[in-house]
Amino acid sequence: MHRLRVLRHLKFCISTSHRTTVVLKNTRSFCNNIPSTSFASEAAAKYEKKSPTEHVLLRPDTYIGGVAMREDQIIWLRDSENRKMIAKEVTYPPGLLKIFDEILVNAADNKARDSSMNRLEVWLDRETARISVWNNGSGLPVEIHPTEGIYVPTLVFGNLFTSSNYDDSEIKTVGGRNGYGAKLCNIFSKEFIVETVDTRIKRRFRQKWYDNMKKCNEAEVVEILDETVKDYTKVEFVPDLERFQIDKLSDDVIDLIGRRVFEVAATLPRDVDVYLNGQKCDVDGFEDYVKMFNDSSSLLFLHPTPRWHVGVAKRNNFFGESHVVLPKIVSFVNNINTEKGGSHVDYVMDKIVNIIKPIVDSKLGDPTKSVKPAVIKNNLSIFINCLIENPSFESQTKETLTTKAKNFGSIFECDAKKTAEWAEQSGLIEDIVEEVLNMKKKKLPGKRVSVSSVRDIVKLEDAEWAGITGTAEKCTLILTEGDSAKALALAGLEVLGRETYGVFPLKGKLLNVSNLDDARASKNEEISNLLRILGLKFEDSNSITRESLRYGRLLILADQDEDGSHIKGLIVNFIHKFWPSLVHTDGFIQSFRTPLLKAKKGDKVRSFFSMNEYRKWADVEEGGKWKIKYYKGLGTSTSNEAREYFSDLDHHTVNFKYTGTTDDDAIRMAFDRDKSDERKEWIRRSENEITNEDDGKTEISYQEFVDGQLMQFGMVDLKRSIPSLIDGLKPSQRKILWTLLNNMDESTEIKVSQLAGAVAHRQSYHHGEESLVRTIIRMGQTFCGSSNLPLLQPIGQFGTRHEGGNDAASARYIFTALAPTTRLLFPQADDDLLQKNVEEGMVVEPTWLCPIVPLILINGTEGIGTGWSTKIANRNPIDIIDMIRRKIDSISTEYEIPPFYEEFRGKLEVVTPTKFISSGKIQLIRPERKNASTFSIEIVELPIGIWTSKYKEKLSKIVETLPVLEFSERHTEKRVHFRITLDRKKSSRFLQKSNSDLLNYFKLRTSLTENRVLFDRNGELKEFGNISEIAAEFFEVRRDLYEKRLKIQKEECEAKLIYVENQLNFIEMVTNGTIEIRSMGRNQLEEKLQEMGFRVDPMATIAKNSKKANYGYLLEMPVSRLTSDEMKRLEERKSRRRTELEAAESADWKSVWRSELDKLAEAVGNNRKS
């Protein structure tokens, strides 16, 4: 008992006190003696703690942009011989370039801190891979940090999250921000050396780290006696090439390092000389750098303030006599190459476009026509070098600026007159006008495929050029997931225009056509519409080309969740099944990706396209709270966000790429019904593999898509379709039940429609309230063939067996509540012991609930998921209760229990341990008189799962061939009763038939085969051979939970006893004068109580309520309680508490479990009587 109290006190200290370290040190030996529970090894395997350095090495893409080779990338490099920039294909590991860039930008940043800096040197040794960066100007202070107790350079270069840039109230125009920088280079290096001179105190500092910053030598600090030595800083490192999957520095890597050195030489002020391997970089400022891309005669250069240097050129241009297509964006912020642009590029580009647009519009000759901004932007190449105050970037790789324009710290004033003159003289205006006019002309000469063929497809927004010979290939059909996604796409067309983009919304999921022929597929309305919209024909399956279609490309706009991935897959499968050549054409099918969630803090906004990407970021994000908004459905995005997405189409579009027959095999495996065994193996494999979430790729093979996004859908689909062995529930059922258990008592009634809304809100459910309504109703149905132990009460019309429950009343008119047996199945004492899930930052339902009997065997289940299906029949609750009793008593349970359905009057026959025959009930009513002319047949029960209305359709066809004199139905709400009166002479053969023959003739027999597939306690899919195996696994989990419950109950009883004892002792000491309340302050009293062995509030401690874990329960007692009468009451309460503790100490899991089983069995019996 004493140890447990110490442990609770330790937990309190950890959460509230700065004395944590001391407490931990003093109690380490005690903690080591605490026995592990049965969950310890499982928890250790599942949860790991990594140091910051280990996390950087384990997840490098979060910090440095990835270590894998990026192949065949088009990069503009310097041609030193001809003094110009040229586009070249290179292959390189981006992370290696990033760690070099961190050191280079650090050196360049020193110019902003010390204007006297005038030299930066980079040395690169190809053979040893040793790189050094040296700069003059003020070095780092060579002093001991007063708080950390180590030298400042050691702190800055060898400890993550250290920076001089954290104070956002101080205006800075440097590249560093988050305290990673040079430390990342240190972590990814075999050797890392820092040397700096601080002439203020005449000290030189040198320190060496190695083995990925895991080890370092002592800092060498020497006094400088030479007065001529100036301040400098030098960083020298040898990158750990193995971590970048290379063994030496390739020509491409060396060229890219040289490019960055050259870029810094161009972006730094002109008074800073930059050298590479002793050779001065031959560039005279940013304007000179821009001229290396383009003839200076066709270049506009704007330099309104020292913080803004902007070059503008036509994208299609000439360098001398050579035609070149210039890069769309070349931009730098505080010497950082922002390769993907960002808010600074948008800011400058919009100002330039606003000047050029009116000029173009005036020359079009038609006041009703206007050039789209996107057309102008596509004709411009823009070069920017700017200084931004305290910049924010999309990620640590700093490729995209996210700072809002109002926070730039300066304004770019675009010279309108100079810009307009340049646009005219360079021929830009003429080029744009010609392009716009040609667009219009292209509508006329081509022959249009019949427009009337699609005019009746009401929801189609057809592209203006769709079906026109010569232009249709350029058209893209955006296929959206429903009407809300269509609205998003239409907002995007404001940016893209309607000439080449059409939109068509799909009604949910497309049909899986894998096992359909042309005729059957074309009968589907959705597929028929797509054939007409796209201009597809089944007979052209081998010869069809993009040029022959109405649209040359498909762009799928679906939700960013798993169901969205499934929709993409079904569309891919549709095209692949009938026109594989189109799938083999790269770029015919594209996917549009939107953020799954956004994080916002002040002006900063971060977008994430997958939970994996978000988690990596969240793991390392430091400081401040971010507001998270989830975009589970496309309808969540606003029209402004839609325009933002479509303005950056390249970033939001993913091309499907065909890489060979493995892609064909992957598509067939995912969708062909004959490939179920392969899908099972695929799913098994996925449980042990990390799937490829959207990692920012703009191109993906079909196999990557199947093994990544589709695999994730498969796992989610299985979890929706197949229940947990532990509670017998699927996720939606569990969310519904937990909402009621956690928020309402058994007597509370709630409208079904309101309950669905509450579940969606409280349990983070995103699949529509209609789906929840259907599940709630099923959970409350009591007719034969539904649940043996319904978890909810059906208050109102929840449907009957005649329609299989589909005749339930509207959710607005019916109510529900917990069924009387539900709390007996799920004891409230377990609620706080269950492991809760967290979704969207909110604590929701547990991973599984834990009933006192395996509910899956009582209520059964049925479900079909990806690759796997499950079917388990209902069984008698009393039989299952008896089986668990036998296991408690260690009596063998290696036997099968036959299926059982409440109120079923037919027969269930066992064929094999997993196969059963369900027979209805038929009665031959023989005539009482020998000469009677008629006799009757009555059908009074149907096989399990056969509903009355469906059977009536079948029966009607049977009796059509019989001499029926009368056919009547006498059903009640719960009973089936068909009566057929036949002519005796014409139907005498029936009088000779056995009951078995009659059952067969009237199709009153069905087979039921069990396929016992369930998720186990760890969430892994498992197939069980018999129900004893299911019961055995359930038993272990339930027993462990009882032991955990009893342990906690004992601790609570101890806490209650200590609470009363302490109050009693306190009152006694106050009344006898041992404690003088009046002469001491609160702090003195608390210290006194601690010295005397009083505990802080034991009830608050065990409840982990740190705010109340103090001495308030003693010191804040009213004076009226400090009496002998109160002491008597407390003595009585103490006696009761001691009795409760003794009962808790003597209780064992077997007796508690038996007691709860008895109560459940009694309730089941009472239900049957009623």
Curated annotation (Swiss-Prot):
Binding site for Mg(2+) 1: 481, 559
SUPFAM superfamilies in UniProt: ATPase domain of HSP90 chaperone/DNA topoisomerase II/histidine kinase (SSF55874), Ribosomal protein S5 domain 2-like (SSF54211), Type II DNA topoisomerase (SSF56719)
Site-annotated residues for Transition state stabilizer: 812
Cofactor note: Binds two Mg(2+) per subunit. The magnesium ions form salt bridges with both the protein and the DNA. Can also accept other divalent metal cations, such as Mn(2+) or Ca(2+).
Reaction it catalyzes: ATP-dependent breakage, passage and rejoining of double-stranded DNA
Top-level class of the enzyme under EC nomenclature: isomerase
Binding site for Mg(2+) 2: 559, 561
Disulfide linkage: none
PROSITE patterns with a match to the protein in the record: TOPO_IIA, TOPOISOMERASE_II, TOPRIM
Entry's localization field: Mitochondrion
Domain Topo IIA-type catalytic residue range list: 722-1157
Pfam families: DNA_gyraseB (PF00204), DNA_topoisoIV (PF00521), HATPase_c (PF02518), Toprim (PF01751), TOPRIM_C (PF16898)
Annotated site (Important for DNA bending): 864
InterPro entries xref list: DNA_Topoisomerase_II, HATPase_C_sf, Ribosomal_Su5_D2-typ_SF, Ribsml_uS5_D2-typ_fold_subgr, Topo_IIA, Topo_IIA-like_dom_sf, Topo_IIA_A/C_ab, Topo_IIA_A_a_sf
Amino-acid positions noted as binding ATP in the UniProt annotation, renumbered to this chain: 106, 135, 163-165, 176-183, 396-398
GO cellular component, one term: mitochondrion
Recorded GO MF terms: ATP binding; DNA binding; DNA topoisomerase type II (double strand cut, ATP-hydrolyzing) activity; metal ion binding
Record family assignment: Belongs to the type II topoisomerase family.
UniProt subunit comment: Homodimer.
Protein name, as recorded: Putative DNA topoisomerase 2, mitochondrial
Source species of the chain: Caenorhabditis elegans
